[in-house]
Regions:
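C-terminal cap/linker of serine protease catalytic domains
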Residues: 19-25, 102, 171-240
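Active-site region of chymotrypsin-like
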Residues: 28-39, 92-103, 129-201
Length: 297
């Protein structure tokens, strides 16, 4: 059997569609709420997900400019009485008085597969009714013991703090930030929510503090360092960054894939194939590396 045929058959298996659980996804949709609060400039808003009785998870950056946030569900508002904050991971858990919303089950980021279908549910633009968007897992990146999720599930302003769900309705991530230029959207792992529940409750707003994705460029993790050169199509710079990445993380399949992509864009085809092969040696289901090899062959 030829190498190209093997690649095509593997890709066909990798991209198999999974069935979705309509009932549990509707429950996930019903768990989405709006976070609001007045600021010096007007009204701030974001999204949140009910993850326990009277507990709503959102992004801390949603709470930076308001002294008195509240939660809206439908046409009813509920006061926020406290918050447990993990500023660096940009996750805040709000205590909400008498919130009549069922919590969603928490999933995890460890078992996610590249290409897996997912659903984003949130309140883009501050819309009172939750909006849904479909997408796929592009990659997961190990960061401080858990996996930050890169997906194609689009979101706009107001969706920060919204939920990313698998097709069974489990919360797998919290939609947080995106990179301009090449349409990739990052979610923080739901795995960080349980440790958040153990933090001390604070009662003073606003919540300030730098988040991981706001780190100085030279201190960012490599999966964020590649964003600017990819956006600017600066393939030589991408080659430099990804060479450093594979040197520091030689067993990272995504690092080798990105190096291969840089080589391919620089017409270093032989080097690209070596890098893609290395990515597949680490993870034989790396569908991006498989696809690029299929294109080359």
């Amino acid at each position: 059997m030829s190498r190209l045929l093997i690649i095509i058959l593997t890709l066909a298996i990798t991209f198999t569609t999974h069935a979705f659980d309509r009932e549990n996804l509707m429950k996930a949709w019903s768990s989405s709420v709006v976070i609001r609060g007045y600021t010096d400039d007007g009204l701030a808003y974001g999204s949140g997900v009910v993850v326990a009785k009277d507990k709503v998870v959102t992004n801390c950056h949603v709470l930076r400019k308001t002294k008195s946030p509240w939660v809206s569900f439908g046409d009813t508002s509920f006061p926020v009485t406290g918050v447990q904050a993990d500023r660096w991971h940009d996750l805040c858990l709000l205590s909400v008085f008498n919130l009549p919303v069922e919590p969603v089950p928490l999933g995890n980021s460890k078992n996610l597969k590249k290409g897996q279908e997912i659903v984003g549910i949130g309140h883009s633009g501050g819309a009172p009714v939750a909006l849904t968007t479909g997408g796929n897992i592009i990659a997961t990146y190990d960061f401080e013991g858990e996996n930050i999720i890169l997906s194609s599930a689009k979101f706009r302003m107001g969706a920060s703090g919204s939920g990313l769900f698998d097709l069974k309705g489990n919360l797998i991530g919290i939609t947080t930030f995106k990179t301009t230029g090449y349409g990739n959207y990052y979610s923080l792992p739901a795995d960080w929510i349980k440790p958040l529940m153990k933090k001390e409750v604070e009662t003073v707003f606003p919540i300030n503090g730098k988040a991981l994705w706001e780190e100085d460029e030279d201190k960012k993790p490599y999966f964020l360092k590649i964003a600017i050169p990819k956006t600017k199509k600066n393939w030589a710079e991408l080659e430099l960054v990804t060479k450093e990445w594979v040197e520091h993380e030689p067993n990272n399949t995504e690092a080798w894939y990105e190096l291969g992509y840089a080589y391919e864009k620089l017409n270093k085809v032989a080097d690209a194939l070596v890098a893609y092969d290395k990515a597949l040696e680490i993870d034989q289901n790396n569908s991006d590396a498989l696809l690029r090899e299929a294109v080359i062959y």
